[in-house]
Amino acid sequence: MRYIKASLLMGVGLLTLGLAGCQSNSHQSTASFKDSSSQSSRYSAKEPDAAVTASSSSKKEEAQTYRPQAKQTRNRHYVKSGNLKKAGQYTFDKVGTQLTLAKVSHPKTTVKSGQLTYKVTTVRLIKNTAKTAAAKRMAAQALNLAQIKSPYYTLQVKFTIYNHGKQALATDGIQAIRLDSKHQLNAANQLSDASAGKTIPANGKLATFATGLASQNTKPTLKTVKIKFAGAFADKKQVVTPTRWLKLTL
């Protein structure tokens, strides 16, 4: 199974992260669904949307210090805390990224595989404008890039996995998100998945999210995307196969 690369993970604005590779979950990344929780029984909105948050590193203090100027907050579209819900609303994360909601949809679409049901509840396209060098550096790190151009756009998918079985399962999260015929996101290619490696308890659920890089500099013209969820495991054996492709409308 693959696990979250995890060096940043959880807020919203953009990067959710659970990047590629087989690494521990000791560091948490953050992304655009600030109200999302990786815990199966919780879903709360306590902190503002964030492109990324610092991992436990020497950069942590630097990443927590950004404060927007007064003129940046004197706008009816500014959201100090809470989810970005309407196109045009924006906020700032702690590392200095301005997050502007470009598109949002609530498909509430489901797909099943074995004892698991996946329900996609929200899809958002976020414009991320880095206001600091730290914001650009951490975004590039989170998306496994040498550097990133600002503004950049991220696709965020919020979903819940329901386990209808009598045994706990470890999910491998999202196998891939297909933006179009030529572009596909996965754990090794700019997709940060908070669900990868998490356990869904028997007769329980996991509310979670993922964020991927949609484009740099130019706003993508996405109308639909497709998502495919990976398999799930029990005692290191695959007991749930990957799902079919699920079409999502933005």
Spans of features found by a protein language model:
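Glycine-rich, phosphate-binding/catalytic loops in enzymes
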Residues: R178
